């Protein structure tokens, strides 16, 4: 029996290319075929949002010249329904509530690949 794996179309809004690669590798090591694009700032983000069909987005609170709040604003303005997971350094109940209230589908600690 054979079946094809579907690629997860992933957009990563991050300020570190190395850490973004680690995120992609964590998903691949978990058995998920992943096709990803990295947005290092707002210009990259807007090009990616306008030019691609994304299934999931991983986002840092700030990256380059942009922020999570800006990401959510662009998604709403462009009518994109992409689930966003916020990768938070300061993982507390307050940051979870704040991220979720701004529209994140989930909030995970930036350094915990198992929760991702």
Regions found by a protein language model. Give the residues of each.
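Conserved phosphotransfer microenvironments
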Residues: 20, 42-45, 50-78, 88-95
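Non-catalytic signal-transmission and effector/linker regions of two-component phosphorelay proteins
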Residues: 1-37, 43, 50-51
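His-Asp phosphorelay/catalytic-motif detector in bacterial-type signaling
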Residues: 7, 33, 53-55, 78-83
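Short loop/edge segments at beta-strand edges and connector loops
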Residues: 38-40, 88, 109
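C-terminal output helix
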Residues: 94-95, 111-116
């Amino acid at each position: 029996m054979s079946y094809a794996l579907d690629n997860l179309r992933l957009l990563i809004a991050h300020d570190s290319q190395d850490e973004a690669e680690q995120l992609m590798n964590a998903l691949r090591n978990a058995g998920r075929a992943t096709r990803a694009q990295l947005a290092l700032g707002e210009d990259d983000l807007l090009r990616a949002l306008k030019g691609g069909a994304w299934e999931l987005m991983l986002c840092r609170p700030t990256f380059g010249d942009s922020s999570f709040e800006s990401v959510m604003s662009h998604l709403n303005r462009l009518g994109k329904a992409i689930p966003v997971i916020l990768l938070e350094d300061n993982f507390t109940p307050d940051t979870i509530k704040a991220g979720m209230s701004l529209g994140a589908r989930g909030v995970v600690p930036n350094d915990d690949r198992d929760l991702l």
